[in-house]
Amino acid sequence: MSRGFTLIEMVITIILLGIVGLFLGNIAGQAMGIYVDTTAREALIQQGRFLTERMSRELREAVPNSVMVANGCIEFLPIVNSAIYSELPSATGPFRLLPINKQVAQDERLVVLPRDAQALLGYPSPNAEQIAVITQSVVFDASNQLTMVDVPISAANPFSLQSPVRRVYLYRDPVAYCYISREQRIYRYQGYPLTRNKLAPDQFGSGVLMAENISRANFVVDVASLQRNGLIKIELTFAARGEEVRFDHNALIYNTP
């Protein structure tokens, strides 16, 4: 003869199922929390890797001693071309060069033995030294691909210091990365003039967002010398959902003065 559950048995069963359900729910909640935390940390790590690798790739091809740091920004001058020369020119040129890339454009600037980042922005300041502006583009063809060419220049002062390896760097527009603390973001800026008033985000126009959730950012410049390359220390701290990831990265500038 069969019989059904008694009321007491049913109540006990419901209580036991509730306890098991709470236990399993707690385990599932912990697992979900671990997954969310892991995902948040991985997202921060990916952002940090992307930003440090992008900055390192650009900085390594910067004009030596062109890096400046101020107001949460780091600015540098990308090399658009380089060349070797035989003799220094007069202030009125021309400058006889053998460019690496066979293109020399009007209004590009060139520098021999760069020593000061601020001076690289200064032409046509009367105090600008070792710097000239190219006054006319040079057209390359089969007749001058492998020979030195005369590049028309105009300089505020004569060139007086030789490069140990007789190298010239050509550049045009600066690039800057700026940390906006109130937004906890880093933006990249380009296309603004060399004649900016100061190194600050309000001088650059609109920037491109490179990373966010940055609680701290610091840039330190170890300038180049004749014996060693320049070194840029990038210190970033990312924070989100209770997770924090710190990056201490060194970017080497490949070129020497």
Where do the model's predicted regions map?
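Generic detector of short, locally flexible boundary/turn motifs and exposed helical patches
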Residues: 8-10, 17-21, 38-44, 143-144, ...
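Long, contiguous hydrophobic alpha-helical segments, chiefly transmembrane helices and signal peptides
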Residues: 27, 50-52, 59, 76, ...
